[in-house]
């Protein structure tokens, strides 16, 4: 087993072949990001980005990896930065184990603009683990409703906030007091009979002659004996669900082609949602405390692909291990196994790999409790039907058309598209925030609200699609 100790973030991979793959990606990325850094925010930036899009939007990342490298950027072809120039053998390494950071295979058959945006705009740099709203020992700080029961506007109880992990972001936005209002969003919503509804599944959106949108939903949906069909009418409806669910779970009625053009419908129907599968299990504390041989992170070219061990604080009896992290075809091929079979097979495969390696020679199975395994299959999760909304080669402009919708057509339909489904940077929190702000700005514009700070829509950029 090759060992790569890279705690400083600048140590090269351990073999010439890996170093070559590493160098080709970093040379390409550095050339592009360095140039973008000189242009971004200037009067020339929009033209530069349009040229990049025009040059690369029809290429898959697989194509970009094999495309010959370009030694010098040419101002007469401003969108062309060449490719990575990898051989078939180097491409196979890049697909399977990346540059030591895990498989890049998830990106191979999507539009190359997605990984390019991820790289040049810094989404993949300086990543931080969100522990939550906690002290140095990992204990939650005092916060509203911590350890208390919470109920929605109709009295249904829902999960109380723990202020742990990434969910803390949602919990703080809902339960923490907004200083200007001297109350939380949760408190505000409870003042209205239908302000906050949980366990409610939207089944239809109907455009009414009055201009309002009727939202039909099943209330108390997890309790079949008490499920009740209800509806409510709104001036504006913000749509945040995964785009495939619009087609499979929600009826759209009485929206004219002017309100909802066929091109928009086609864009969200044909969006590409990546499949992904994660296999978690409980991990004995002794693995990370006493084991000095098996690495904390393993990147393999077997069906398990990537493995990560995570150390919880002492309040937890066990740590956690991600036994397998896969995307796309590598995740789909695991569908033939039950959750129990998959967890057990992952441990057996890791044991096989470790026992064959002369510098390992010991199994991982004694540390892993597969009886407490959890498998997340995003494509069969009824609330997701996919893990991240990306886009195929040639469909970047379709994705951008969904981002344009709020400004161009939402005032006619009453629908505002928000979240990962309607972005070109899926998988990160940034597009969710950006599209949320976009919806608020456009609702303010539609309702004639006064903007603060001298802001006007003239200051707000237009998303550009192919002419």
Could you say what each language-model-derived stretch is?
Residues 201-322, 326:
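Mid-domain catalytic core of redox enzymes
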Residues 103-106, 184, 205-206, 245-251, ...:
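Short catalytic/ligand-binding loop motif for oxyanion handling, primarily in non-cytosolic enzymes
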Residues 4-28, 236, 241-245, 390-410:
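Core domains of carbohydrate- and sulfate-ester-processing enzymes
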Residues 40-205, 211, 219-222, 233, ...:
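Active-site/ligand-binding neighborhood in enzyme catalytic cores
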């Amino acid at each position: 087993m090759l060992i790569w100790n890279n705690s400083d973030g600048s140590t090269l991979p351990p073999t010439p072949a890996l170093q070559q793959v590493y160098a080709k990606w970093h040379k390409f990325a550095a050339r592009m990001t360095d140039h973008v850094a000189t242009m971004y925010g200037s009067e020339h930036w929009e033209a530069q980005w349009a040229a990049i899009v025009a040059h690369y939007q029809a290429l898959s990342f697989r194509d970009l990896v094999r495309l010959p490298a370009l030694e010098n950027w040419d101002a007469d072809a401003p969108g062309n930065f060449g490719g990575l120039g990898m051989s078939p053998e180097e491409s196979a390494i890049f697909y399977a184990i990346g540059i030591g950071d895990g498989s890049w295979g998830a990106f191979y058959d999507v539009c190359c603009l997605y990984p390019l945006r991820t790289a040049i705009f810094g989404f993949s740099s300086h990543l931080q683990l969100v522990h939550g709203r906690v002290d140095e020992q990992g204990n939650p700080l005092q916060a509203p409703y911590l350890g208390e029961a919470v109920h929605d506007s109709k009295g249904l109880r829902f999960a109380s906030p723990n202020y742990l992990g990434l969910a803390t972001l949602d919990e703080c936005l809902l339960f923490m007091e907004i200083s200007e209002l001297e109350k939380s969003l949760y408190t505000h919503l409870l003042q209205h009979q239908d302000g906050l509804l949980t366990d409610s599944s939207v089944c239809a959106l109907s455009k009414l002659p009055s201009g309002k949108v009727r939202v039909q939903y099943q209330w108390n949906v997890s309790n079949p004996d008490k499920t009740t069909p209800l509806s409510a009418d709104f001036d504006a409806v913000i749509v945040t669900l995964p785009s495939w669910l619009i087609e499979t779970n929600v009826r759209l009625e009485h929206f004219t082609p002017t309100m909802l053009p066929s091109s928009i419908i086609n864009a969200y129907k044909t969006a590409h949602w990546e499949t992904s599968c994660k296999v978690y299990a409980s991990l004995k504390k002794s693995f990370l405390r006493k084991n000095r041989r098996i690495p904390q992170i393993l990147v393999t070219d077997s069906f398990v692909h990537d493995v990560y061990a995570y150390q919880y604080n002492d309040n937890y009896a066990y740590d956690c291990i991600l036994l397998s992290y896969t995307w796309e075809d590598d995740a789909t091929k695991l569908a033939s196994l039950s959750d129990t079979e998959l967890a057990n097979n992952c441990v057996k495969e890791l044991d096989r790999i470790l026992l064959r390696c002369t510098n390992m020679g010991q199994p991982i199975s004694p540390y892993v409790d597969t009886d407490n395994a959890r498998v997340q299959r995003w494509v069969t999760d009824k609330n997701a039907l996919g893990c991240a909304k990306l886009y195929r080669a040639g469909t970047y402009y379709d994705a951008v058309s969904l981002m344009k919708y709020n400004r161009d057509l939402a005032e006619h339909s009453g629908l505002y598209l928000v979240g990962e489904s309607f972005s070109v940077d899926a998988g990160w929190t940034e597009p969710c925030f950006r599209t949320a702000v976009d919806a608020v700005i456009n609702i303010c514009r539609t309702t004639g609200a006064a903007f603060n700070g001298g802001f006007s829509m003239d200051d707000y950029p237009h998303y550009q699609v192919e002419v």
